[in-house]
Amino acid sequence: MYSPEEAAELKRRNYRSIREMIRLSYTVGFNLLDPSRCGQVLRIWTIVLSVSSLASLYGHWQMLARYIHDIPRIGETAGTALQFLTSIAKMWYFLFAHRQIYELLRKARCHELLQKCELFERMSDLPVIKEIRQQVESTMNRYWASTRRQILIYLYSCICITTNYFINSFVINLYRYFTKPKGSYDIMLPLPSLYPAWEHKGLEFPYYHIQMYLETCSLYICGMCAVSFDGVFIVLCLHSVGLMRSLNQMVEQATSELVPPDRRVEYLRCCIYQYQRVANFATEVNNCFRHITFTQFLLSLFNWGLALFQMSVGLGNNSSITMIRMTMYLVAAGYQIVVYCYNGQRFATASEEIANAFYQVRWYGESREFRHLIRMMLMRTNRGFRLDVSWFMQMSLPTLMAMVRTSGQYFLLLQNVNQK
């Protein structure tokens, strides 16, 4: 489909669309462009970040143990602990599935499935191919533009909440250091946690700096690991949707007047070959994210309820800082699941339209072999592609609505327990 020069330009253009995600992935130890041994040196940084974050779990546990009866105080502690534990799970999954993720991302960036499509080679002498190519390029460009928008919105949401946590703790500690006597104040860490042995050390070196390092590592991977991992999902999911839409556009022209009747069977076979490639790619994407996203969906059920509860507490105490922080947290955490469910719904819908595309061609006036291929494809496309969350649910808008309702019930439960 593409000449070598066009393929190189396409690869550069797609890289520019996701360059923020790729550059950010380096900072959490993921090299999405080089799976070789040299490119895997960054794995050491992944291990350092994950071990440091696991060490900070001690501070969260101590916070929970001391204030176990103060639900408003431990709610945020529990939520952030669950968040960085999920991020650690994603980081370690990246370590073991690095080659698989790299290959999928490479296929997407290079439009490998479109380049392998026999239609553009065997039917290159037909005038309809130029029209199809323009439609396919327009479709793929539209979905890659959508990919960039989603990644940037997600990135800015995570930057806002992580920056708020860090700057708020840093500024408050400096203010207390210069305005209050030594030993008369408690330090505030980026994430709510407690280290009893160093509780009265204040800002002394190295006690304060060790605590800040551990909690900053946890805070950083909460936001940036999410953007890196979920950003890959956005790229692969929307690229798959673009491939399905492009396949539909190819199939729709199977009985066009621009395709000679004696070549329509061969044309349809090329579409069937492309369908099989798209089906294999969609299955690989589903298998790659199927189980690891289950922890994220479970976490979001609790964290949405916790965030709503913290917002209600901040509203009752007239705490604007808590309200702003929880609002930003809810936006980032909510957008994370919206990305999965909304794109998963687009994925499933595009898959269902493939069968309709085969049925809508004017097959009733074609040869017996052509009609036989159409019947075969109607049977094969009867079961569409979808993105699953383990074995329990599907990434779709109904799943999103069910999660919102469940989180609301969890929020009401927390309020009732807090009032007793």
From Swiss-Prot:
<feature type="transmembrane region" description="Helical; Name=6">
    <location>
        <begin position="321"/>
        <end position="341"/>
    </location>
</feature>
<feature type="topological domain" description="Extracellular">
    <location>
        <begin position="65"/>
        <end position="76"/>
    </location>
</feature>
<keyword id="KW-0325">Glycoprotein</keyword>
<dbReference type="GO" id="GO:0004984">
    <property type="term" value="F:olfactory receptor activity"/>
</dbReference>
<feature type="transmembrane region" description="Helical; Name=2">
    <location>
        <begin position="77"/>
        <end position="97"/>
    </location>
</feature>
<keyword id="KW-0472">Membrane</keyword>
<keyword id="KW-1003">Cell membrane</keyword>
<dbReference type="GO" id="GO:0050911">
    <property type="term" value="P:detection of chemical stimulus involved in sensory perception of smell"/>
</dbReference>
<feature type="transmembrane region" description="Helical; Name=7">
    <location>
        <begin position="388"/>
        <end position="408"/>
    </location>
</feature>
<keyword id="KW-0716">Sensory transduction</keyword>
<protein>
    <recommendedName>
        <fullName>Odorant receptor 63a</fullName>
    </recommendedName>
</protein>
<feature type="topological domain" description="Cytoplasmic">
    <location>
        <begin position="1"/>
        <end position="43"/>
    </location>
</feature>
<dbReference type="GO" id="GO:0170020">
    <property type="term" value="F:ionotropic olfactory receptor activity"/>
</dbReference>
<dbReference type="Pfam" id="PF02949">
    <property type="entry name" value="7tm_6"/>
</dbReference>
<keyword id="KW-0675">Receptor</keyword>
<feature type="transmembrane region" description="Helical; Name=1">
    <location>
        <begin position="44"/>
        <end position="64"/>
    </location>
</feature>
<feature type="topological domain" description="Cytoplasmic">
    <location>
        <begin position="98"/>
        <end position="150"/>
    </location>
</feature>
<keyword id="KW-0807">Transducer</keyword>
<keyword id="KW-1133">Transmembrane helix</keyword>
<dbReference type="GO" id="GO:0007165">
    <property type="term" value="P:signal transduction"/>
</dbReference>
<dbReference type="InterPro" id="IPR004117">
    <property type="entry name" value="7tm6_olfct_rcpt"/>
</dbReference>
<feature type="topological domain" description="Extracellular">
    <location>
        <begin position="409"/>
        <end position="420"/>
    </location>
</feature>
<comment type="function">
    <text>Odorant receptor which mediates acceptance or avoidance behavior, depending on its substrates. The odorant receptor repertoire encodes a large collection of odor stimuli that vary widely in identity, intensity, and duration. May form a complex with Orco to form odorant-sensing units, providing sensitive and prolonged odorant signaling and calcium permeability. Involved in the behavioral responses to butyl acetate, isoamyl acetate, and hexanoic acid.</text>
</comment>
<feature type="transmembrane region" description="Helical; Name=4">
    <location>
        <begin position="218"/>
        <end position="238"/>
    </location>
</feature>
<comment type="subunit">
    <text>Interacts with Orco. Complexes exist early in the endomembrane system in olfactory sensory neurons (OSNs), coupling these complexes to the conserved ciliary trafficking pathway.</text>
</comment>
<dbReference type="GO" id="GO:0032590">
    <property type="term" value="C:dendrite membrane"/>
</dbReference>
<feature type="topological domain" description="Extracellular">
    <location>
        <begin position="318"/>
        <end position="320"/>
    </location>
</feature>
<keyword id="KW-0812">Transmembrane</keyword>
<keyword id="KW-0552">Olfaction</keyword>
<feature type="topological domain" description="Cytoplasmic">
    <location>
        <begin position="239"/>
        <end position="296"/>
    </location>
</feature>
<feature type="topological domain" description="Cytoplasmic">
    <location>
        <begin position="342"/>
        <end position="387"/>
    </location>
</feature>
<feature type="transmembrane region" description="Helical; Name=5">
    <location>
        <begin position="297"/>
        <end position="317"/>
    </location>
</feature>
<feature type="glycosylation site" description="N-linked (GlcNAc...) asparagine">
    <location>
        <position position="318"/>
    </location>
</feature>
<feature type="topological domain" description="Extracellular">
    <location>
        <begin position="172"/>
        <end position="217"/>
    </location>
</feature>
<dbReference type="GO" id="GO:0005549">
    <property type="term" value="F:odorant binding"/>
</dbReference>
<feature type="transmembrane region" description="Helical; Name=3">
    <location>
        <begin position="151"/>
        <end position="171"/>
    </location>
</feature>
<dbReference type="GO" id="GO:0034703">
    <property type="term" value="C:cation channel complex"/>
</dbReference>
<comment type="similarity">
    <text>Belongs to the insect chemoreceptor superfamily. Heteromeric odorant receptor channel (TC 1.A.69) family. Or63a subfamily.</text>
</comment>
<dbReference type="GO" id="GO:0005886">
    <property type="term" value="C:plasma membrane"/>
</dbReference>
